[in-house]
């Protein structure tokens, strides 16, 4: 079957499928990704190949990960005879994405992210080994605003800190709902993430626990959250820890920037480990 005549399947609501059908937006996303001939490009949720058609032949290898069996079959029918295209049928959150880019010298990721799994999928991309040099995602506009939000505004939260602690996050452009079929109930946006070279030193599990505890109590003073949040289980001297980091004990979590959260998470973990060893 030719690329231009691939059989199209109906969107499946259970899988959160909304296909990007606007060719102008498709090309803008590919320009944002800016694939190089030496890259391995990982595309998750390629659908009918709306973006893939612009990526085939532009990178060393294109890995298409599609959960929907019918869509995966259509992708194999279009490009299965190409040595530089791999079609992987499976759930991106379960199959271990790093296995498909392990031999890559350079990795880029692109995805039209299903709204119901946005956060776990974003972090799965950020935890790839080897790390991606660029990640371009189409997400719900509200989520895009949370990803790039600075401290001190309502949109700033655990997702903002978790992403910005390990990547430079940029709002690329808005995507109207009419660019998709079926038409979703909300607008979307494209964000660009570029992982930081020093991100390997971030204790992501401790950071995630800390930010969730803090932003679940975002209007409380930081010192009170650190003392009382059961998920933190920190029995050390909170004021001493905050003093060493030059953090005001009365500050609210929404005012702390991501690097400060990273330092605080590391200090709390060190404090707990030190207490356990005595």
Regions found by a protein language model. Give the residues of each.
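Catalytic cores of RNA-modifying enzymes
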Residues: 1-213, 243, 254, 263-278
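Short helix-coil junctions and helix-kink-helix linkers
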Residues: 227-232
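Short helix/strand-capping connector loops at secondary-structure junctions
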Residues: 240-249
């Amino acid at each position: 079957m030719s690329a231009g005549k691939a059989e199209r399947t109906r969107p499946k609501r259970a899988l959160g499928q909304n296909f990007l059908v606007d060719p102008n937006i498709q090309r803008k996303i590919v320009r944002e990704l800016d694939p190089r001939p030496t890259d391995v490009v990982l595309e998750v949720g390629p659908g009918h190949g709306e973006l893939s058609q612009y990526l085939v032949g532009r990178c060393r290898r294109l890995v298409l990960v599609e959960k929907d069996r019918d869509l995966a079959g259509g992708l194999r029918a279009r490009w299965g005879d190409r040595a530089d295209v791999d079609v992987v049928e499976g759930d991106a959150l379960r199959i271990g994405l790093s296995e498909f880019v392990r031999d890559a010298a350079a990795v880029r990721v692109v995805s039209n992210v299903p709204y119901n799994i946005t956060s776990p999928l974003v972090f799965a991309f950020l935890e790839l080994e080897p790390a991606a040099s660029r990640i371009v995602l189409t997400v719900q506009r509200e989520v895009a605003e949370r990803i790039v939000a600075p401290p001190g505004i309502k949109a700033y939260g655990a997702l903002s800190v978790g992403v910005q602690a390990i990547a430079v996050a940029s709002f690329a452009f808005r995507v109207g709902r009419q660019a998709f079929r079926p038409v979703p109930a909300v607008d979307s946006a494209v964000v660009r993430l570029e992982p930081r070279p020093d991100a390997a030193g971030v204790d992501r599990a401790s950071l995630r626990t800390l930010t969730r505890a803090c932003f679940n109590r975002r209007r409380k003073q930081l010192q009170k959250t650190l003392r009382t949040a059961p998920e933190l289980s920190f029995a050390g001297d909170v004021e001493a820890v905050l003093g060493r980091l030059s953090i005001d004990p009365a500050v609210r979590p929404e005012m702390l920037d991501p690097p400060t959260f990273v330092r605080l998470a590391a200090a709390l973990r060190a404090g707990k480990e030190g207490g356990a060893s005595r």
